[in-house]
C-alpha cells in the first residue's frame, strides 16, 4: 500500500494486490518460438548471469518465474530473494526482503552463497553490492537471474557499468539480457 498526500487535500492510495498462483509456462508467455528457443538455450547453461529488463509492470518477475519453472527439477537447488514474494513455486527456497529487519538483497545473497545453490534469483539489482555479488556468484559456478528497471538491453549494460562493475568480469559473467514490454492484444472475438 502506498499513500501520496498532495496540496489541496487530495491523497492517492495505491494498493498492489497479488494473487498467489502458479508461474506461467515459458511457451505461454507470448514469445515467438525463435525467441523462446534462444531464451531456453541461454538459461540452460550451468552458470552465468541473466537479466530481464523493462519498465515497471512489464512482467519481469513473471518472466523470471517462468524461467525458473522451466529449470526447476528435484535435483536443482534454487534460491530466490524477492521484495515481496509474488509467485510461489514448489521446490524453490524463497526469501522475502525485509528492510526494516535489515534483510536486504545483498545480505540474502551472501547467505545464499553459503547454502550451496545451483540457481539464484534476485528480484531486483538495485545497488552495486547486489550486482557485484551476482557477478561473483555467476563466476564461481552459479546461474544467477535478476531484473533491472531499464528500457533496453544496451541501457542495462550502461547502467550496470555506471554502478561500478568491472567490465571484464561482467563480460565473462553475462549470459544475456531479455528486454521486454507488455503488448496489448485483442481477444479472438474482436474484428478489425
Predicted regions and their residues:
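Short, flexible helix-loop junctions that flank or precede catalytic/ligand sites
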Residues: 1-192
